Amino acid sequence: DALRWTALHSSNALDICIKMVKEILLLRQYAHTNIKIIMATRNFELEDDVRLRNWISEINSDVKQMELKLFEPDQIKPYVSQFEDYDQLSNEQQNILKIPLWLGIYMDLANDLGCAPKFTTKLDLIKSFIDDRFEQLTDSHGISTANSENFFNEVINLMNQANKLSVSSTQLSIGSSEIKKAMISVGLLTEQNREISFRHQAIHDYAIGKKLYSQGLSSPEDFLHELGSKNQQTLLKREHLRYALAMLYEADERAFCNCIEAVLFHSEIRFHLKSLVFSTLRHIENFKAPLKKLINKIISDSDLAPHFIRLSCSGCPTLVQYLSENQYLSDWLDEDDEMQSKALELLSSVSDKAPNLLINELSKFVNRSPEWNQKIYNCL
């Protein structure tokens, strides 16, 4: 993971990992050496990278897979219950607080405010956190918002130029030591071995995402330019893109759609960024004309359509409903090939949430043949 997606990106990272693992397995087998290797990868890579998936399958007998899971409600409630009833939060809010990073930011804010922070999305939480810290810089340290913003942006720009999450304190402008100390005091920055970093990586991601958002409002071309070349499209950019798209959707749906289209249809954009775009689409509830037009274009593209169906539509009643209303599902069901199977899988994925969709689409196939009856039964 680190070899492949950090600023020190290596195109042959998987080859290096395969060679390392092979050598370790040989040591275990012939030298009886009790040595193990831990390899971290993200779910989307394990699912979408065919070569990685096949390699893991080949050495499956020597692999123990461990999934890093989210907090359970019983682990979260003792913290949140100090400020509000966790069970009364929306599903989206509860899911955000299951992630340790966001629960930590929530608690920091709640303790400072003396009450539960108002939020709907991660974007709300991190923006509130930064605003709260800037207020503390003014109230407790006498530092103006303008000076805080200038220093904050200086740190962000230095990190961005170096493609790193930290910056040497020797690179900071002369006379900034007091602001630096104040930002460490209020919990915006940390310093170790003269290296400055943000207390939460989400602060850095939000700041870069905001810049990407500004470029997206300007034009899709500026948006792509800010994402950078393939070498620069690290996993860090994934989080920046997530924030930028959330802000674009709130501000201007047409600009949001134009930027999504630019990312999906550009050959020089890495798939892990396109994968994020597909995941973003599944969380949109209301489709206006620009987004409907874009969805139709994606479905008509033979390369993008399978990923859209799997990553955006599967399990998403809103999108499956759209496919039904626009005759895509009925057309696919009338085909006798892979698309029919995909249509049935989509209907099955929303059978609990939208049973009427299954009735509308499958009623005409009841008793058409024993095979069709079995397919319908499987969907249910």
For each predicted feature, which ranges?
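Walker B catalytic acidic pair
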Residues: 1-2
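Conserved Walker B catalytic segment
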Residues: 5-35
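Soluble or luminal CAZymes and related metallo-dependent hydrolases
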Residues: 15-20, 71, 147, 236
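Generic structural signal for alpha-helix starts
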Residues: 32, 90, 168, 269-270, ...
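Extended hydrophobic
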Residues: 43-49, 55-218, 222-230
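Extended amphipathic alpha-helical scaffold segments
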Residues: 164, 192, 210-380
